[in-house]
Amino acid sequence: MEKASGRQSIALSTVETGTVNPGLELMEKEVEPEGSKRTDAQGHSLGDGLGPSTYQRRSRWPFSKARSFCKTHASLFKKILLGLLCLAYAAYLLAACILNFQRALALFVITCLVIFVLVHSFLKKLLGKKLTRCLKPFENSRLRLWTKWVFAGVSLVGLILWLALDTAQRPEQLIPFAGICMFILILFACSKHHSAVSWRTVFSGLGLQFVFGILVIRTDLGYTVFQWLGEQVQIFLNYTVAGSSFVFGDTLVKDVFAFQALPIIIFFGCVVSILYYLGLVQWVVQKVAWFLQITMGTTATETLAVAGNIFVGMTEAPLLIRPYLGDMTLSEIHAVMTGGFATISGTVLGAFIAFGVDASSLISASVMAAPCALASSKLAYPEVEESKFKSEEGVKLPRGKERNVLEAASNGAVDAIGLATNVAANLIAFLAVLAFINAALSWLGELVDIQGLTFQVICSYLLRPMVFMMGVEWTDCPMVAEMVGIKFFINEFVAYQQLSQYKNKRLSGMEEWIEGEKQWISVRAEIITTFSLCGFANLSSIGITLGGLTSIVPHRKSDLSKVVVRALFTGACVSLISACMAGILYVPRGAEADCVSFPNTSFTNRTYETYMCCRGLFQSTSLNGTNPPSFSGPWEDKEFSAMALTNCCGFYNNTVCA
């Protein structure tokens, strides 16, 4: 009994903390018979007081202690590791910038953007609620009202002064300004509720578009940034060749359009899906929508959808606000549709760039269209109902359903296959239909002795005045009018393909006029045309938009059908207003070719610069009968002028070459 009671009095302390349990050791000694020599896996006899479990626990004690320490200070270790990585990256970036800043410019820009996002998020968490509380008293104050009117007055005076000073040197820029006024009057005349138009929203949207256009087109910094951005996008899209060449072969990728442009859609769709999964697309859309909402006074849902159209297509953007479409007003639905018709998606942007269209102009046109789409929509279909979404509180953008980046990339590529095949099918069908229409019109014209009657010719006559109001030179108007007509009645892909053909002819140094027919359009006309074609506003898009929105809110099919035609017309006007903005703001950039020294270089091939220099030389040349020709202007008294004339006559036919 004493021994038993003695055993009970011994405390069996735990070994979880690594301490020795004397009670357990004593019990093991008493149970084991004398003389026992049995050895455990570690070579220790049980008689020495160290059984298997006791020894293992004691041997694991340092590791348990270390693991416990790591768990306790895990956050500190992460911060230290993150700090070391940031220091290493900063050192790497500094070294790259010192060695060659131009080469490291892309990395520097990406780093600045990441820092901006992180600082913005930090300040929003730290000061966001405080700033909201501080600004809340001014929301309905008289000071805010006066501030709006003062800002509007200053903006109007600034616009008048700018137009007066800028157009003094180039009076032709007033023509597209009159074009903007013309399109605004047309939209107002077709407005659903004339008395309900919010002119603050209209002029705020047009003002934002104008200011952004000045930054992008006229300022050196903005122009350089978007030119650089366009070049980076082109370089990035060229990586598609690595995948398409492996699948189809180098020959097909270089020579066949379907294997050159369509894989870009798949690659870009994959990238957009990854960015959407990471939340970057939603973040940018929310910031753009917030800025548009506070400046224009539009509701949260319609602004989010229009801002989303900058990055995704007209069927994908409504998915951003899918839970709210059922409760949106007709004016808001009209704005959502207009935004889809007035812009292009990021995936299609890659295909247009593959055509050879200027990337920076496409990006600028897509961004500039967003505020103009909201303004034009509220002019054509003003709000007369009470919206439930005046504030963006409670309106959240959904995240992707994918579980990891690889799944997002795969789903994006697979989804883009449908878009790529849709583009290919549309090009095949619409080009065939256009050829048939032209053949039928030509046949009908020949019956009454009208030669060469085609769909393009009809558009060139009907739309020529409108195109002239966009700022296009009169000699270029027929060709631009053809493309605008093709874009609206056929497809924007066919129109951009035609534009790329004109651009390639110009760059190849082809003569501007051959047998009385113009072969290409000027650079100014190319830029204006790029803006005017940048949108999905064509007749075939009506079915696409109705089908996409009806699948989301089938109970509102009748409401969607009521506004879709008006939204199509409004979206087309948005693209034309953007083209007018480009016509006002565009000025020739870049140093002109030094034509006097240019002939000293080898005349190995024809280029646009060669043609322009030779045309100037032909205009400066005077024939003197049997005497050698004389030269005027910059070619006067130049020893090599005669040699340059001989070289130019080898490329181009001119009367002075006889």
UniProtKB/Swiss-Prot annotation:
Q: Which reaction does this chain catalyze?
A: adenosine(out) + Na(+)(out) = adenosine(in) + Na(+)(in); inosine(out) + Na(+)(out) = inosine(in) + Na(+)(in); guanosine(out) + Na(+)(out) = guanosine(in) + Na(+)(in); uridine(out) + Na(+)(out) = uridine(in) + Na(+)(in)
Write down the membrane topology. Multi-pass membrane protein
Q: According to the UniProt record, which cysteines are disulfide-bonded?
A: none
Tell me the InterPro entries matching this sequence.
Answer: C_nuclsd_transpt (IPR008276), C_nuclsd_transpt_met_bac (IPR018270), CNT_C_dom (IPR011657), CNT_N_dom (IPR002668), Gate_dom (IPR011642)
Note the Pfam families from the entry.
Gate, Nucleos_tra2_C, Nucleos_tra2_N
Q: Where is the composition biased (Basic and acidic residues)?
A: 26-41
Q: Where is this region: Disordered?
A: 1-55
Activity control note:
Inhibited by formycin B.
**Protein name per Swiss-Prot or TrEMBL:** Sodium/nucleoside cotransporter 2
